[in-house]
């Protein structure tokens, strides 16, 4: 019985150490904005998009721009 409690405490400790949004939803199929940007041929840039590209959105959580040629 003590082993069960020990394992339960260890699992709770491991989950409490994770940062919010560590990838629980991403691993279930939800994709990040950065992933979507890259999949659609864009690239993430912290400054404004170059003149030969256009703004497609953001690459959260840092909110850099998603630029596409």
From Swiss-Prot:
One of its GO terms (cellular component) is sperm midpiece. Its main location: secreted. Residues 22-32 form a propeptide. One of its GO terms (molecular function) is identical protein binding. Keywords: Antibiotic, Antimicrobial, Defensin, Disulfide bond, Membrane, Secreted, Signal. One of its GO terms (biological process) is positive regulation of flagellated sperm motility involved in capacitation. Detected in kidney. Disulfide bonds join 37-66, 44-59, 49-67. It is found in: Secreted; Membrane. Residues 1-21 form the signal peptide. Pfam families: Defensin_beta (PF00711). Belongs to the beta-defensin family. Monomer. Homodimer. Has bactericidal activity. May act as a ligand for C-C chemokine receptor CCR6. Positively regulates the sperm motility and bactericidal activity in a CCR6-dependent manner. Binds to CCR6 and triggers Ca2+ mobilization in the sperm which is important for its motility. This is Beta-defensin 1. It comes from Mus musculus. The lineage of its organism: Eukaryota, Metazoa, Chordata, Craniata, Vertebrata. The gene is Defb1.
């Amino acid at each position: 019985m003590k082993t069960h409690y020990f394992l339960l405490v260890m699992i709770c400790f491991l989950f409490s150490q994770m940062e919010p949004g560590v990838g629980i939803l991403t691993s279930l199929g939800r994709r990040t904005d950065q992933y979507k940007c890259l999949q659609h041929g864009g690239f993430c840039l912290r400054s404004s998009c170059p003149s030969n590209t256009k703004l497609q959105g953001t690459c959260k959580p840092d909110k850099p721009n998603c630029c596409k040629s």
